[in-house]
Amino acid sequence: MWIEKNIIIINKSRGFHLITDEIEKKVPEINDFRIGILNLFIKHTSASLTINENADKSVRNDFEYYFNKMVPEKDLNYEHTSEGDDDMPAHLKSSILGNSISIPIKKGALDLGTWQGIYLCEHRNNITERTLSVIINGVNN
């Protein structure tokens, strides 16, 4: 069985945001699968998706801090600057982390590790929403 849809993630400020619960609420079809795979793809070039530590908020703060050190804004060597100081660094950060993730589904639930969560990584300052393409493939209950 296949399921495909788009979902909107609204009003995430710049930073690393745990969205596992939001995904589970907006994609209740996960519960219908005995076994399968969930693929999430973000339809933007200045935000990304990743899976990482879900328990300690300081992990999110550390990610933002070190990504900003690795890929600083206002670098005089950037040529693509017409959309603001945060735009080109956002493209680079997005390329480093990636735009899609795949997660196993088992017995109607995401089969993440104990400390794993899904992150939306927002690399721009003033974004109101992001669109994710959701595809599930598997065997239903």
Segments from the language model and where they lie:
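Active-site histidine-anchored catalytic micro-motif
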Residues: M1-N141
